[in-house]
Amino acid sequence: MADDAGLETSLCSEQFGSGEARGCRVAADGSLQWEVGGWRWWGLSRAFTVKPEGRDSGEVGAPGAPSPPLSGLQAVFLPQGFPDSVSPDYLPYQLWDSVQAFASGLSGSLATQAVLLGIGVGNAKATVSAATATWLVKDSTGMLGRIVFAWWKGSKLDCNAKQWRLFADILNDVAMFLEIMAPVYPICFTMTVSTSNLAKCIVSVAGGATRAALTVHQARRNNMADVSAKDSSQETLVNLVGLLVSLLMLPLVSGCPGFSLGCFFFLTALHIYANYRAVRALVMETLNEGRLRLVLKHYLQRGEVLNPTAANRMEPLWTGFWPAPSLSLGVPLHRLVSSVFELQQLVEGHQEPYLLCWDQSRNQVQVVLNQKAGPKTILRAATHGLMLGALQGDGPLPAELEELRNRVQAGPKKESWVIVKETHEVLDMLFPKFLKGLQDAGWKTEKHQLEVDEWRATWLLSPEKKVL
């Protein structure tokens, strides 16, 4: 009770991070007496005195802070200010990521042993020149693949970071399997290890790029460098442990291909499962096409906006690498119009800084963006395109859209531009409510992860309108 009274009449207080606060009261001799709490795992609750001349020599650390050994480990392996300085999904993701890194390290040891065996290590008939030539071909193939893949898919990795992260790790398992099987067919050894290294270089690009995107998501205090550095420290520790375990494992499997292959399949299964759990633990708070499609569908059917946690839990992870081209944002204007009449059809009836063309037969939407189009405009254009796609679906829709869908699905088909014009009017009423619902649910609408090309255009409005 005395402790409680001390807290009630405390002169000042302090706390470490998000830990429990402690109060300070004045003792009879004028010294400061700090209340120490938060040591729940020891069941301690006591007070200690700090004299004016010994302010920095307190007996016990800050309440709510870890004990000295745990504090040291946290300082080495976790970002400063953890857990407040990172996203809520940081810890579960990092734990599963460490498990997958450990399994991958052991699998990599088995693959490296197989490659060295195939090159000729331990074989008196093998020549240095042949081994060197094989190694050079393998490395050069991987370097070229790295450049080509970065050019081909580099701009798309941000949009589906979770899917590409999972894809990269599965491809890494395929690459290691090829390396393990390479010595079995010596005549194809060079081609097999070159293909494997090509896959590993793609993994390096996709994995590194998506890891950077996830670091941006996890860092909540502009501490991306700290989060990245501590992630590297965690990975190094896991790799070190994996190396020590490999030193014990390799002598056991050496000379027994069947047992080695069995270990590899077990580690691969663990690796894929841990990767799936790690990626599934992520809660991205920005909208890409997949998450926007889920949220919009739920909103049109039930009138509620899914929060980021629910939407990320429903987001498919095994698809999305090569999505159907149903929505294209930032297309060139010359692709959509070839006459003044066609331009007038797209422009009239609205003043939004984007033009939308809908191909009903292929359910494909192409959007031309104005020079002034910002994140909100792009989000509206994407919502508009996905809403048009919903007109050809079967789920329940709001009354305005249900009536429009009945007219669309009842032949003969209307001109697409007429439907687009009518949906502009519906969206004028629907989108402000939808946008507010997104913000209230916790989505970050000031930025997005939609795939947008770089084409921009300017145009005049229809005669009854003014210049945009």
Swiss-Prot record:
Its main location: membrane. The modification N-acetylalanine is found at A2. It is a single-pass membrane protein. Keywords: Acetylation, Membrane, Phosphoprotein, Transmembrane, Transmembrane helix. The chain crosses the membrane at residues 247-267. It is found in: Membrane. The keyword Methyltransferase does not apply. The keyword Transmembrane helix applies. GO terms for cellular component: membrane. The modification Phosphothreonine is found at T49. Belongs to the RUS1 family. This is RUS family member 1. It comes from Pongo abelii (Sumatran orangutan). The lineage of its organism: Eukaryota, Metazoa, Chordata, Craniata, Vertebrata.
